[in-house]
């Protein structure tokens, strides 16, 4: 027999699907989510939430007061899209060239809106819930959100986050105490050589040759510098140089990402990237400049908050549907900035499709699995009703 909260949430399923697909068709990149922000505010207003406030440009917080009580918690959903050209072929595909919801933030937003509608109508809790619709997750926007004083404006005991994962069985909640997602660092290496005619390479300093050696040399960081028992990743995702087949360019640019769980490992990786880039480039007579951008630190769950999250997940999916993760995920999540200053927990919600086509996150053919909308919204509502119980 289904719990009443789940039955009521399921009645909102078709409405959540409509919201999700509208958002999917109109994706917006980080800190430019103006239409998305307006969409969220209009829905919250129609639900008669107590307050609607904006923050950090396009961010939105909906405030719902329950019955008497001073306690408060926050529920966070990310709202931004990615600079990826969509290839899903769905009728509601992106209408914006080169931009799509390839990470499911359209679904995250729809689930939190569904929870908002239920909570505003029932108010079966004591205290206050803050519905946090956060911009720019893909580029580390939570850092600015925290710096702008989100938790000063909206004081709360704990904050919770959730993400869909198409690699996990649909409807299952996956959890882990401590580190659950890796720190994410982006880096750019600019190698400067000297241009020359392709038939006269001796007059130049070839940054492509230097860069090619550098790509290989960087692989030694994880295999020869990091303890094998520590998780770490160094990936080069972009190598750009030159335009002509018969010309040696003056410059080559490599872009990549590094991931780690332990901060000491992260320091070693960053120092190694700088050292190897300098030494390899100079060995070819070139020079290298390295720029690094920290997207997010390691996402670390608080054990007590995670216990509360597990209880809510169990109420929705049953004990068999709540699975402890053996390993963290090496993807990054800027919710880590919120967990760095506020007790809270981050949980995964399985979204694997039953058919053979099941694109992963950030794939051009990815489309959020609408089958989990009710599950995610029910989780949010149970989290509120259990922690702020009447």
Report residues per predicted region:
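Acidic/His- and Gly-rich active-site-bordering loop/insert found
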Residues: 2-101, 110-125
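Divalent metal-coordination and catalytic microenvironments
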Residues: 23, 62, 75, 105, ...
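Active-site pocket-shaping loop/turn-to-helix segments
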Residues: 26, 202-209, 263-270
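Short Gly/Pro-enriched turn/cap motifs at secondary-structure boundaries
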Residues: 52-53, 177-181, 327-329, 337
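Histidine/acidic-residue-rich, glycine-tolerant segments that coordinate divalent metal ions
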Residues: 61, 82-84, 88-100, 106-107, ...
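Non-cysteine beta-strand/loop elements that form the S-adenosyl-L-methionine
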Residues: 76, 85, 187, 346-351
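Metal-dependent amide/peptide-bond hydrolase catalytic core
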Residues: 212-390
